[in-house]
């Protein structure tokens, strides 16, 4: 019975710290230092939320740049089902899936002259990635230009405008946020 009081005191103390103080403190600091990120990095147009800068969307129309495939198959880019496909590189099912994606991209982009960029046929670890390389976006320019009656130069400039450089020059690569890029495309039509 003597050991019960210290154990119960420790339990209550840790419950208050880990279940109350720590979550409230990290939430408050997040809201104070990083309010946009802490609230989901929402992209707004007026009062309308158009998406998140952190989660991709399923753009399938020829007039939009396509992002990485989603690993959340039933509902693409479903954040509640986040996760990779868990197919090993040696799995024949992954080979079939990638071959089907390459064939679909080749059919949708018949004027593309180079091989299909790898990030357009492979899902990210989260299955929700919204970024592709500027090269993968540029690969899609002929299709988007034709569908929207825009020049290659206009789309090249738009990709350059929405390209983000890595925080550390030699770690990572430049990326383009597909959601922001496609919203900018819609604004060109206005």
From Swiss-Prot:
InterPro entries: KdpC. The keyword Nucleus does not apply. It is found in: Cell inner membrane. Disulfide bonds: none annotated. It is a single-pass membrane protein. The keyword Transmembrane applies. Coiled coil: none annotated. The chain crosses the membrane at residues 10-30. One of its GO terms (molecular function) is ATP binding. GO terms for cellular component: plasma membrane. Pfam families: KdpC. Keywords: ATP-binding, Cell inner membrane, Cell membrane, Ion transport, Membrane, Nucleotide-binding, Potassium, Potassium transport, Transmembrane, Transmembrane helix, Transport. Part of the high-affinity ATP-driven potassium transport (or Kdp) system, which catalyzes the hydrolysis of ATP coupled with the electrogenic transport of potassium into the cytoplasm. This subunit acts as a catalytic chaperone that increases the ATP-binding affinity of the ATP-hydrolyzing subunit KdpB by the formation of a transient KdpB/KdpC/ATP ternary complex. The system is composed of three essential subunits: KdpA, KdpB and KdpC. Belongs to the KdpC family. PANTHER family: POTASSIUM-TRANSPORTING ATPASE C CHAIN, POTASSIUM-TRANSPORTING ATPASE KDPC SUBUNIT. This is Potassium-transporting ATPase KdpC subunit. It comes from Escherichia coli O157:H7.
């Amino acid at each position: 019975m003597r050991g019960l009081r210290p154990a119960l005191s420790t339990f209550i103390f840790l419950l208050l710290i880990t279940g109350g103080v720590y979550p409230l403190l990290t939430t408050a600091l997040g809201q104070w230092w990083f309010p946009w990120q802490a609230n989901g990095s929402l992209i707004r147009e007026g009062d309308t939320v158009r998406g998140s800068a952190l989660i991709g969307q399923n753009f399938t129309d020829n007039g939009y740049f396509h992002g990485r495939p989603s690993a959340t198959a039933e509902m693409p880019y479903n954040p509640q089902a986040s996760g990779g496909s868990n197919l090993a590189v040696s799995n024949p099912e992954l080979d079939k899936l990638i071959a089907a994606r390459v064939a679909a991209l080749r059919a949708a982009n018949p004027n593309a002259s180079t091989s299909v960029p790898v990030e357009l046929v492979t899902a990210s670890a989260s299955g929700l990635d919204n970024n592709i390389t500027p090269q993968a976006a540029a690969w899609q320019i002929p299709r988007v230009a034709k569908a929207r009656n825009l020049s290659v130069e206009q789309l090249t400039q738009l990709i350059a405008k929405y390209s983000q450089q890595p925080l550390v020059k030699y770690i990572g690569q430049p990326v383009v946020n597909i959601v922001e890029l496609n919203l900018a495309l819609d604004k060109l039509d206005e």
